[in-house]
């Protein structure tokens, strides 16, 4: 299962095989939170998350990264989970990747 988090860019224009599996496009922090609750259950794990930083109003990609690495949701990630940021905002992109990488080191899932 892959997540594309971006309010404007269509994942089909950026990810060659988008839509082949259980791919989910979240356009806001609120949508991402809702999609986690609906689609990630039981033994399902997140395969990859593509983060944008600026999501319009009501949260950022960094908020999404903070949510998925929180004690309530970190179970949805495993040692096969990966992430990237396609944000054009260098500050936001670095903050997201740094947080996700720090989570990986802290949880020893390297």
Residue ranges of predicted features:
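Catalytic phosphate/metal-binding cores of nucleic-acid and nucleotide-processing enzymes, i.e., regions
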Residues: 1-110
């Amino acid at each position: 299962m892959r997540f594309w988090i971006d309010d404007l860019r269509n994942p089909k224009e950026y990810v060659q095989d988008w839509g082949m599996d259980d791919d989910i496009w979240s356009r806001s922090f609120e949508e991402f939170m809702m999609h986690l609750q609906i689609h990630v259950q039981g033994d399902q794990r997140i395969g990859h998350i593509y983060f944008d930083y600026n999501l319009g109003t009501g949260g950022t990609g960094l908020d999404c990264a903070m949510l998925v690495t929180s004690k309530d949701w970190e179970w949805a990630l495993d040692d096969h989970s990966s992430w990237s940021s396609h944000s054009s905002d260098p500050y936001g992109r670095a903050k997201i990747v740094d947080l996700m990488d720090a989570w990986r080191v802290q949880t020893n899932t390297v």
